[in-house]
Amino acid sequence: IIPIITMAFHFSPNGDIKRNEVNNLVKAVMNGAGLAGHHGGMCDAFRQSIDWQFLIGGQWVSHPNGITDYKVNIKNTNDPITDGIQDFDYHSEQYYMHVDPLNEVLATSKFKGNEVWKLEQEPGHPGSDTYITEWIKDVEMPVIWKRKIGKGKIFYISLGHFAKELNHPEMQTMYHRGLLWASR
């Protein structure tokens, strides 16, 4: 099962998933289905569903600086998903997430602490409050993880804001391998 849309609000105006829908998805994974996805299509989906978040192992919180340059650090070079991949530079949104400590983390990124955090405003509100995120300096954030739930497997990669990023060699290789891993 692959969530193929970018954000949950494409399903409904509020980005909701019905309880019976998420319950059926959980049952499918528990019984051996694989679930894989990337970026906001998986971890910024269904913000109101705690069961969805618990299943996939994380929830997007912010991407200070918007599109920015950062390094993806491979944490486990012995895994089939990351085999032969070295640390690499990346240009996109760097996700700050709430993540399950039970995830098997395969790659991370580190925040510099100089990112600009722009607060969301009410529609029509002029200006924007901004802050420098010095408190997240050196925070190591998972970028790729996998997990097993029941008989099923879940794979997630936070990269891929723009479709062209799917052509990035390292991202493409690990995403492809992760999809295959989750499907077996």
Regions found by a protein language model. Give the residues of each.
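Structural recognition of the beta-strand scaffold that forms the well-ordered cores
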Residues: 1-5, 29, 34-38, 105-107, ...
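A glycine-rich, often tryptophan-bearing local segment used as a flexible ligand/cofactor-contacting loop or short
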Residues: 7-84
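Histidine (H) residue identity feature
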Residues: 10, 38-39, 63, 91, ...
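Short flexible/disordered coil segments
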Residues: 41-50, 97-103, 126-132, 175, ...
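Short, solvent-exposed loop/turn segments at secondary-structure junctions
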Residues: 7-8, 42-44, 110-113, 149-150, ...
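Extracellular ligand-binding/catalytic regions of CAZymes and related secreted enzymes
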Residues: 56, 115, 123-143, 148-184
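Glycine-rich loops and low-complexity Gly/Arg-rich segments
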Residues: 5, 9, 28-30, 60-64, ...
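Catalytic beta-strand/loop cores that center a nucleophilic Ser/Cys/Thr
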Residues: 64-150
